[in-house]
UniProtKB/Swiss-Prot annotation:
Binds 1 Mg(2+) ion per subunit. Binds 1 thiamine pyrophosphate per subunit. Pathway: Metabolic intermediate biosynthesis; 1-deoxy-D-xylulose 5-phosphate biosynthesis; 1-deoxy-D-xylulose 5-phosphate from D-glyceraldehyde 3-phosphate and pyruvate: step 1/1. The keyword Magnesium applies. GO terms for molecular function: 1-deoxy-D-xylulose-5-phosphate synthase activity; magnesium ion binding; thiamine pyrophosphate binding. Mg(2+) binds at D151, N180. Catalyzes the acyloin condensation reaction between C atoms 2 and 3 of pyruvate and glyceraldehyde 3-phosphate to yield 1-deoxy-D-xylulose-5-phosphate (DXP). This is 1-deoxy-D-xylulose-5-phosphate synthase. The gene is dxs.
Length: 639
């Protein structure tokens, strides 16, 4: 284990107010020390390293120039917030990042006054910032609002909706576009920096104000002519952009790793901006750490690693991951059916669709961070006879729900939805938990909703979805490894709406939807030992329910427990509704529904989170005993 880095200047900075006492000439050293501290911390915890390394100078410059937390600083997504946390009173806890009882991996309002708006999903910063900027104007304060958004997040429609509204409102909002893929335009050295300083200065920014005053004096009829004249003059210096068309004063691109470029531009904007300003800053993801700079993903998300070599610690898997099983099964089906296409919203490796992309690039579509578009794009493909697999994380499917309802479900289009990261996801906490998809999909008429109990079942569900053309169909599966079951050579086509009984009993029935099946089997052993012969069933489907299976369990057992990795309103609610409507609750059946708790659970290891939620074997046994009013001592005997 290496010693912590030597950081004499950074040691003087507890809060941004301390940073403002440091001379400009010493800022590059502070940046080096901050980068070293961040690398060392993430080597211990794992996390999102590359994005933070890319914004070290930018984060320092913003906190030095602006009066945070009075001035509001909002980071989009939040992957890049680790340097910000170190500078805002949280350095002593930085090695608890993403750990149980530790710092969140994202900005979080409850954690610090320097986090005015929480984030984790993309493209929200400009909308939130605009709300805060308008609030400042309504409150007649001089508060500045700065939103930092990456070029990737700009692919989402919400970002452009906010830009359009901000321009129309002429709000005092500063948007910093962090272009870390050089996908928009590279800076052009000293001349670019000079022009950016010039464009952000009082003279050129004043031209816009002159235009506004002339419009007010002479009337709106000549508004467009004045605007064209002002922007034409500015165009000789800065070049016209779409941002200017939306009403923003555009500065840049500038070098996001140069304090000589950043500090004067930010100071000019702070002192002179009267309306919306967009500063285009070019940075390098992974900057300053050779292994990250050399890696294809720039160390976007890493496990713990050796600081010297960059080698990441990866435990040898006991079974293939669910994501890998899905990817391999989809490739297998795609080889046999040229109508199968894959769609991802900027997550090809996370969803496993990169495997399909490598083999069938013409049939794989990465639409960017645009889940709404992804869903309706898939609907269009389905309408023309193709078989789209729109692979999204559960938490991101939420972003396209209206499209699922309006464009897919109402029209009965056979879009396939592989839903990754179902249930608790561990270190990423509540913003990334897959809690709600079962509830919001099972409520839609004509939707088939499945959950895989293990990796073999997942393979069956991929083939089932590929073969199903009657309407939309989904199947959910968690992050992480499978349970190590024997894998079929190819998946089977499952009968729609039919579950299976895994183990027969007579007193207690455990009906599982998803991967809690393994815990149900462990619980059944304990219940059998306690004299409660237990049936274990795998529902497979939340919609349509296996009515015959549920009737059988209800009529021949004293207790029926539904178990799922989702929020209330999902599978268990569907079962209870069916039981009530058929009168199966009228004769003494004790039914309990185990779901994710009705609260936002902070990050921890998934096993710990499920234990706290009562969704492990012990929690299931406890629920059965409580339902039967058994003596608590019996529970202790099974511990």
């Amino acid at each position: 284990m290496t010693s912590k880095p030597n950081t004499p200047l950074l040691d003087q900075v507890v809060f941004p107010s301390d940073l403002r006492k440091i001379e400009d000439k010493d800022m590059p050293q502070v940046a080096r020390e901050l980068r070293d501290e961040m690398i060392d911390a993430v080597s211990v915890t794992g996390g999102h390293l590359g994005a933070g390394l890319g914004v070290v100078e930018l984060t320092l410059a913003i906190h030095k120039v602006f009066n945070t937390p009075e001035d509001r600083l909002i980071f989009d997504v939040g992957h890049q917030c680790y340097p910000h946390k170190i500078l805002t009173g949280r350095r002593e806890r930085i090695r608890t990042l993403r750990q149980e009882h530790g710092l969140s991996g994202f900005t979080k309002r409850a954690e610090s006054e320097y986090d005015p708006f929480g984030a984790a999903h993309s493209s929200t910063s400009i909308s939130a910032g605009l709300g805060m900027a308008v609030a400042a104007e309504l409150g007649q304060t001089d508060r500045k609002v700065i939103a930092v958004i990456g070029d990737g997040a700009m692919s989402a429609g919400m970002a452009f909706e906010a830009l359009n509204n901000a321009g129309a409102l002429d709000a005092r909002l500063i948007v910093i576009l962090n272009d870390n893929d050089m996908s928009i335009a590279p800076p052009t050295g000293a001349m670019s920096a000079y022009l950016a300083r010039l464009a952000s200065g009082r003279t050129y920014m004043g031209m816009r104000e002159i235009g506004k005053k002339l419009t007010a004096y002479l009337g709106k009829n000549i508004d467009r002519a004045i605007t064209r004249a002002v922007e034409h003059a500015r165009g000789y210096v800065t070049g016209g952009t779409m941002f200017e068309e939306m009403g923003f004063y555009h500065i840049g691109p500038i070098d996001g790793h140069s304090f000589d470029h950043l500090l004067p531009v930010l100071r000019n904007v702070r002192d002179n901006a009267k309306g919306p300003v967009l500063i285009h800053v070019v940075t390098q993801k992974g900057k300053g750490y050779a292994p990250a700079e050399a890696a294809a993903d720039k160390y976007h998300g890493v496990n713990t690693f050796d600081v010297i070599t960059g080698t990441q610690a990866k435990a040898k898997p006991n079974a293939p991951s669910y994501t890998a099983v899905f990817a391999d099964a989809l490739v297998e089906e795609a080889r046999l059916d040229d109508k199968i296409v894959g769609i991802t919203a900027a997550m090809p490796s996370g969803t496993g669709l990169d495997k399909l992309q490598n083999l069938f690039p013409e049939r794989t579509f990465d639409v960017g961070i645009a889940e709404q578009h992804a869903v309706t794009f898939a609907a269009g493909l389905a309408a023309e006879g193709y078989k789209p697999f729109c692979a999204l994380y559960s938490t991101f499917l939420q972003r396209g729900y209206d499209q699922v309802v309006h464009d897919v479900a109402i029209q009965g289009l056979p879009v396939r939805f592989p839903i990754d990261r179902a249930g608790f996801v561990g270190a990423d906490g509540p913003t990334h938990a897959g809690s709600f998809d079962t509830g919001f999909l099972a409520s839609l008429p004509g939707f088939v909703v499945m959950a895989a109990a293990d990796e073999a079942e997942l393979k069956h569900m991929v083939r089932t979805a590929a073969a199903y053309d009657e309407g939309p169909i989904s199947f959910r599966y968690p992050r992480g490894e499978g349970v190590g079951v024997q894998m079929p050579e190819r998946g089977e086509i499952l009968p729609i709406g039919k579950g299976r009984i895994i183990k027969e009993g007579s007193k207690v029935a455990l009906l599982s939807f998803g991967t809690r099946l393994a815990e149900c089997l462990v619980a059944a052993e304990d219940l059998d030992a306690a004299g409660l012969p237990t049936t274990v069933a795998d529902a497979r489907f939340a919609k349509p329910l296996d009515l015959d299976l549920i009737r059988q369990l209800a009529r021949h057992h004293a207790v029926l427990i539904t178990v799922e990795e989702g929020a209330v309103g999902g599978f268990g609610s569907q079962v209870l509704h069916m039981l009530a409507n058929e009168g199966l609750l009228d004769h003494g059946l004790k039914v309990r529904s185990l779901v994710l708790p009705d609260l936002w659970m902070d990050q921890a290891k998934p096993d710990v989170m499920y234990e706290k939620a009562g969704l492990d074997a012990k929690g299931i046994v406890s629920t059965v005993f409580t339902a039967l009013s058994r003596d608590a001592l019996a529970q202790d005997s099974l511990a």
